[in-house]
Amino acid sequence: MIPQTSSLPKPHGGVLVERIRVAHPREYDHLPALELDERAYADLELIATGVYSPLEGFMGQADYLSVLEEMRLTNGLPWSIPITLGVSAQDAASYRKTVRLTKDGRTVGLLDVEEQYRPDKEHEALAVYRTTDLAHPGVAALFARGDVYLAGKVQLLTLDRGPFPEHHYTPRETRQLFQERGWQTIVAFQTRNPIHRAHEYLHKVALESLDGLFLHPLVGSTKSDDVPAPVRMAAYKVLLERYYPQNRVLLGVYPAAMRYAGPREAILHAISRKNYGCTHFIVGRDHAGVGNYYGPYEAQAIFDHFRPEEIGIHILKFEQTFYCVTCAAVVSPRTCPHDTQHHLVLSGTRVRELLRAGSPLPPEFTRPEVAEVLRAAYQTL
């Protein structure tokens, strides 16, 4: 673990966890193997690189229950979503001590099993997602996992930087980059969608008073109908090249899986960005939401459950923004006097329908260069 000494915000809990071990994976071939799916590997990486500081491993039952009931770890630190590793009851008997963690058959890490326990998944679903509806993608993923949770500290042996290695930064690396650039105030923006004009508006409003923007799209597992990560990354790049000041933006990828936990996931996203070194985090309308499971601004209101210093990152709360044809600008309810018939608002579902049909996206909704990247990509999907 690395003490925090720079002017950037301290990591959650005061130290940046690093549990990366330099060793040849073949040294551990004698250990029982546990194959990780995409979500479990993402959690392993995020623990080991410090994104999930102060966690050093998958949660034991005491922390798990405390997070469900209180949104805090047993040491009192705010934490909103259990980070756990599920296996089948049959396989659990084989995992009693040190376990070799594999991805696609390759050894990528180690887990020192300290505890096994059975969760109440219905209770977990209601606490985290506020529903047990299997149509909710987060709930479906929860019930598809094994019924026994393994807890213990982890070590990462292989950091897989995925398909975007030049943008795949660890918290240690982003903190170094922010310092090299002389940024003292950094706003992070989380997205799983292509950037449209309303997003651009939020970014530039924030950049009027802050030093840098950390554009940090999630590229882990998402719903099947979300825009694929390679397409989104191409769209982000063309947008940044044409419309953003290059010396004030850093594009990175957030390798987490999307949980669609709405308000609780907003807290996890904010804490994670604090660990990357950011001082501010944008939370807009229906952050990390899906369907109609959460109210449009519940992900903002949940931060009121904590004292600001407990979260340790400034939350920038924005209302829905949209293009007003009468104002001829991107505006919000705070700045636009016109009713909704003057507003251009396209849902993600409608955008995907237009793309699949080969129809152009309105320039009031997104930049033409972005629209062309999306149109071309969808013609080949």
Swiss-Prot record:
GO terms for biological process: hydrogen sulfide biosynthetic process; sulfate assimilation. It comes from the Bacteria. Pathway: Sulfur metabolism; hydrogen sulfide biosynthesis; sulfite from sulfate: step 1/3. Keywords: ATP-binding, Nucleotide-binding, Nucleotidyltransferase, Transferase. GO terms for molecular function: ATP binding; sulfate adenylyltransferase (ATP) activity. Its EC number is 2.7.7.4. It is an enzyme of class 2 (transferase). The keyword Transferase applies. It catalyses: sulfate + ATP + H(+) = adenosine 5'-phosphosulfate + diphosphate. NCBIfam families: PRK04149.1, sopT. PANTHER family: PTHR43509, SULFATE ADENYLYLTRANSFERASE (PTHR43509:SF1). Belongs to the sulfate adenylyltransferase family. This is Sulfate adenylyltransferase. It comes from Chloroflexus aurantiacus (strain ATCC 29366 / DSM 635 / J-10-fl).
